[in-house]
Amino acid sequence: MPLVNIKIAKDNVTPEKKAELIKGATQLLVDVLGKNPQTTVVIIEEVDTDNWGIGGISVTERRKLGL
């Protein structure tokens, strides 16, 4: 049973977009690895931008700086 864990910034991603991510990730494993879509698990974790850092700066701060 393959498991895909997708981490995204908590950014008002709509349920429809999350459904697209789940469908797309599942299909990718079917197409590339021949996995059964019925046993493929996709988890989407939304991370608060204060808890996500890039280059030593939180995503919240990077956005304020226009980076």
What are these regions (language model features)?
Residues 2-67:
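A domain-level signal for the structural core that forms small-molecule/cofactor-binding pockets
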